[in-house]
Amino acid sequence: QAGFGDTLAWFARAFPRVQVEVHCEPSVNLRRLLAEDRLDLALITCTPGAETGEVLRREPTVWATAERHLAHEDEPLPLALFQAGCPFRDWALAGLSGLGRPYRIAYTSASISGVLAAVTAGLAVTVLGRSVLPAGVRPLGAAEGFPPLPPASITLHRGGSVSAVAECLAGYMREGFAAEALSSSMSTGNPAILA
């Protein structure tokens, strides 16, 4: 998310001598790394009601396709998804299976840029948080034959021995997500919900 990148930049300017290392992994892997005390902090996506960390944000989850292509009409439906263990992937597959709609996983990536590359090129459909849809990508809904999706909760988790610096970064993340949600609600009329 742009807001996450902005938050990291804000923190880096405030603490130029602190080196932050970022891992982009499925939530299941992040939980394992936290349990092994190999991460100080993790942002984990889950369904509201299943949160175990500090909820930073809740937002609508949408099916997404390129504005200028018709991948969403293909049979079987081509999908660009995150790796196994990601809730967005699970929600997409469960939704399509529930409809009995044929699909194929055409692209798999651990990063949002990899998923969006396939979608913006018109090669696949994906499931994402509404706030991360870039220009040229639009949401799909029931009128186009796509099932509803659960909202996403973005939660902050801490490792076993978190330093004062990591707690400070957690504070920056909290503030960054709050500012992003406010900005999103003011510009789109589709607010993300702060916890």
Question: Where in this protein do the model-derived segments appear?
Answer:
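Central regulatory/effector-binding core of bacterial HTH transcription factors
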Residues: 1-49, 191
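A late-sequence structural motif
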Residues: 3, 144-185
